Amino acid sequence: GPFLVQSLKRDSDSFWSGDAFAVIFDPVNERTNGAIFGVNSEGVQTEALITGEPARRGGQLSGYNKAWDNKWYTEASVSENGWTAEMMIPFKSLRFGKKDHWGINFIRIDANNNANHSWAPVPIQFYGTDLGYLGQLIWDKPPKNTKKNISFVPYLLGDAYKDFENQSNLNQSFDIGMDAKIAINSNLNLDLTVNPDFSQVDVDEQQTNLTTVNLRFPERRLFFLENSDIFSNFGTNAKPFFSRKIGLDDDGNTIPIIYGARLSGNLNKNLRIGLMNTQTQEQELPGNNYSSLALHQRVLKRSVLRGYFHNRVGFSEGSIKGDDFNRIGGLEFNYSSVDSKWRAMAGYGLAFSNENQDQNHIFNLLGGYGGRAFNVMVNISGLGDNYINDFSLIPRQKHYDAVQDTTYILGFNHWWATMGYKFYPENTFINQHGFSLTTNGDRTTTSNELIQDKHALSYKILMKNTSTLDLTYAHEGVNLLYPFRFTDDDTPLPA
């Protein structure tokens, strides 16, 4: 010691910046999905689903779902010689079959020496959580599944109030509902909800938005969490599915859900399925029925062929509104080499409604290489002017005109590319240093007008004492296509 602890909050964003120990499980042993459980020297826990290749883009860490929570137990103690941790993880929190080989790895973060260690070696250019480099846990006998893994959580809420000043009558209200989770088998799970109560869900972290782009908050509602990557892991910049579009309006206010059913998991070792249906309540606006189907078929060693179909249909006065619908479909191929160095993606999708039948496409292309020293990645994506997706929150698609009080939907093409080179000197105070060049931007599909762009050249030195020297030259521009104001009281900025 002393040992570094950045936060005592569970699942903190700064958890991995301090001393920590973690174990990774891949019970299916296909190197495409896993779960990580971590603890620091003060016994603070974190856990997450690993839903892809861990990476950073735009300062955001991707490939993890930290909203996934399970009940497990840890104890940690600090002594003169170091610190120790004891972990007890109930296997009922994992989905596994009768396989006697699991993927596993152990990670140790030594913050004082700015070093990460893993039991199964991982090349230095990758995160220690990369599933392509897991070791093997071999069971003499595979662990037994719990015969009955069913949880049922009913609730009853009531309130009463009276205005004594105005001598009003006593007003009372009651609400009842339930949530259920049923393990169909060791790899397939059924979630059910009736009139769900999401009042226990963590509130969104308040953020100030001074941009023209809507903020994207993480999903925290339990019903939508398990195996959420089956539905959401499509695309890069423009993703065709975002579960917070169901049961929440654009301002985060609740739209009551009448019921929901969700089947997700592995049908076999190579095929994952997600099937969901939910119904929202009719209020001032018609209710909606949302249906989603997503399939992930593993091909080659670590590659995945994926497809999705989403359907929204309006309901009013107990009947379907035939002219109020939105249907989304698409296919995607995601290639990853066994050693994780090469990666490629290609996807195409269409959106249908009763009004728009052309310029309703979305596409995504990505390719790159990540070696020990040299890395390069290029991503090009785009969508048409009539790609209207009620299941998605796509940045820079909607543009608000503060003068006309009108929102315009525009198709755009997006590019993002990065290239870098790292050096690993053998001396006493530098871990690594290197440069990177990054560019990204968006232009409208029809008129090729610039929406935004950013170009940056960076040189970074990482010291062994955890210090960092970062020299960056960046040029960033935003083109207002329509007048914009930060608040309702501001004078709009001209386009």
Predicted regions and their residues:
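Beta-propeller domains
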Residues: 282-365, 384
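Outer-membrane beta-barrel translocator domains and adjoining extracellular loop/strand segments
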Residues: 50-52, 117-119, 164-169, 204-207, ...
